[in-house]
Amino acid sequence: MSSSLPPSSCDCFVSLPPASLSSFVLFGKNSDRPRDEVQEIVYYPAASHPLGSKVKCTFIEVEQVRETLAVVLSRPAWLWGAEMGANEMGVCIGNEAVWTKEPVTEGEALLGMDLVRLALERGPSAQKAVQVITELLGEYGQGGSCREEPEPFIYHNTFLLCDRSEAYVLETAGPYWAAERIVEGARNLSNQLSISVCPWSEHPQLRSHALQQGWWDGQGEFNFSVVYSLEKQPERMAAAKLRYRAGQELLRMQEGHMTVKSMQSILRDKESGICMDSGGFRTTSSMVSVLPRSPHEPCIHLLSATPDPSRSVYKPFMFSPRVTQVPWVLSPTFGEQDPVNQIPRFQTQVDRRHELYRQHQRALEACKGNKEAEETLRQKQLKVEEENLHWVDTFLDTSKSADPVGGSDIFRICVEKELALYKETGEK
């Protein structure tokens, strides 16, 4: 039996001009997952693949394409896909769990997180990425356990996708889906269907299926979120509605003034539950992206790589010809002995903590119970982050004439600086 207990939260945000202070598009996401799950930051360069080859995703294989784009991913270390990420063309995607009237199935298929990675690798624009996901959804379906436990935990997915000029919300219920296009203003997602009437695009049988199931009479206005949402929502899904409204209000308060810092402050908001830690779940990783309108200006992606953004540091990553994987945010691998590769799956646990995660955890433990030490560590973290953001601001101001290789080492440098801080704290 699959678990029907949804996680407490997951929140995605996008801000386009005129909601953004500058001409940039801003993307943000908190990944809220089982509290002990580790997320790693993984970089994959662009690649060419043999005709007719396949790619092994978390549970199943799919047909590979000839060319894949370079991607940076924030992902639970046990799976193939990603909770959120970006590609070299400036496309950002985040996914969220959703439960609808369409039942989940027990069989293994593509995880929503697999679809995130596949769309980033294959989608040079947000619109193309929507097409990639819907085509794969139709061919392979979605399903499979989404956490490292023997009891399956299965859900369907919603996605927020954006690029330098526009954004899309893609919401699914089994194989069925609806999409909304956003060209200005701000939008958020919080573990629920939110597309109402007149979707930008939809599954060709979306309405006829609802009619056959008796969810819609075919006469009144077709409202996707009303027709496909569960009539009796679990308690935690009711909490998602409150978070959704809180997210809308936080976006409204920043309307016309949204910056990287204000997006970070939204993702760090504890009162709303957007930055959460309850019921066995917490924010395990966080991401903010800055997407300039001009294709000649590089996009910058800020990643935490550690749990709880209110006690973490955002570090800038930029695609460039010389960028390489940073080992200290990469989890160990276990090959065929990995519990995800054993049948039955997830009968044992392994330690997936990467070096930054370990040192972050150690520093927090060293300060635990000592308010002065906790505040000192937080102020040092904020100072490091302020230096990181100063680099971002400076680079964006000068990037029109800058060589993109100038940012190839910035993520590595920032991770090393953060590691040094935690090691110093943990040794005291």
Curated annotation (Swiss-Prot):
This is Secernin-2. Pfam families: Peptidase_C69. The gene is scrn2. Belongs to the peptidase C69 family. Secernin subfamily. It comes from the Eukaryota. InterPro entries: Peptidase_C69. GO terms for biological process: proteolysis. The active site is at 10. GO terms for molecular function: cysteine-type exopeptidase activity; dipeptidase activity. It comes from Xenopus laevis (African clawed frog).
